[in-house]
């Protein structure tokens, strides 16, 4: 298998404030977390894991041949859960890169995962994350995050507000990160920062501490399921692609 020095970790927990038992919600006949895992697994990496505190989530994943790492329910963020899971991977001294894929993107494209891995390995960035060019209408919801970058594609700032102000085209941030191992270790050792807490975006902790985030363009905005309305959109999308035989 390719990228033996990379681990993909999908953090997933049952407790969600906006959508009860979110990972176990059905899209068609398959749970959200199973769909995420199956999409990620298509990237073809041996070290692919779901990190969870839930026996129910673990059961869903192991039944389809996936690997699960149990983590403490008190872990505060997905990135911290990713790091705790990484520490429990057997022979993890051979892993130099960790990809954190959020467990709420049921149609995430495997090509996007592979793209950030290649970009991370061939750059000097601490972290790499995908972005998509979109228009104003596509990102006006407060749950969406936009990013401002410099001419080289280095992230300058992330916000739940539309940035830059007055633009008609924006860069939508996809919730997936490729970390160098030492960057992930450093991130979890840092305390939450002012901008991070203000925007409720943990990636700002990286920028406020002088670390670098590179961005790479991907083609499509993946559906993220955070609310009941998001779930309805995901089900509708699934029904549409099923009719097309995709």
From Swiss-Prot:
Subcellular location(s) per record? Cytoplasm
What Enzyme Commission number(s) apply to this enzyme? 2.7.7.38
Gene Ontology terms, MF aspect: 3-deoxy-manno-octulosonate cytidylyltransferase activity
Q: Which reaction does it catalyse?
A: 3-deoxy-alpha-D-manno-oct-2-ulosonate + CTP = CMP-3-deoxy-beta-D-manno-octulosonate + diphosphate
The family annotation for this protein states: Belongs to the KdsB family.
What is the role of the protein in this entry?
Activates KDO (a required 8-carbon sugar) for incorporation into bacterial lipopolysaccharide in Gram-negative bacteria.
What PANTHER family does UniProt report for this protein, alphabetically?
A: 3-DEOXY-MANNO-OCTULOSONATE CYTIDYLYLTRANSFERASE, 3-DEOXY-MANNO-OCTULOSONATE CYTIDYLYLTRANSFERASE, MITOCHONDRIAL
- From the Swiss-Prot or TrEMBL record, give the protein name: 3-deoxy-manno-octulosonate cytidylyltransferase
Whichever gene encodes this chain, its name is kdsB
């Amino acid at each position: 298998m390719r990228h033996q020095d990379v681990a993909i970790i999908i953090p997933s927990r049952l407790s969600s404030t906006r959508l009860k038992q979110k990972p176990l919600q059905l899209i068609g006949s398959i749970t959200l977390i199973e769909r995420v895992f199956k999409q990620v697994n298509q990237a073809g990496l041996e070290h692919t894991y779901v990190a969870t505190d839930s026996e129910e989530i673990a059961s869903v994943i192991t039944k389809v041949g996936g690997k699960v790492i149990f983590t403490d329910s008190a872990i505060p963020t997905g990135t911290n859960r990713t790091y705790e899971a990484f520490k429990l991977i057997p022979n993890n001294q051979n892993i130099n890169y960790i990809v954190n894929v959020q467990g709420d993107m049921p149609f995430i494209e495997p090509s996007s995962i592979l793209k950030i891995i290649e970009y991370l390995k061939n750059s000097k960035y601490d972290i790499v994350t995908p972005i998509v060019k979109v228009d104003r209408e596509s990102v006006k919801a407060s749950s969406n995050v936009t990013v401002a970058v410099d001419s080289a594609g280095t992230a300058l700032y992330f916000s739940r507000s539309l940035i830059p102000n007055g633009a008609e085209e924006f860069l939508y941030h996809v919730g997936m990160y490729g970390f160098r191992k030492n960057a992930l270790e450093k991130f979890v050792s840092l305390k939450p920062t002012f901008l991070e807490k203000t925007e409720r975006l943990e990636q700002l902790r990286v920028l406020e501490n002088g670390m670098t985030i590179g961005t790479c363009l991907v083609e499509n905005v993946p559906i993220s399921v955070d609310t009941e309305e998001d779930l309805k959109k995901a089900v509708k999308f699934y029904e549409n692609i099923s009719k097309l035989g995709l």
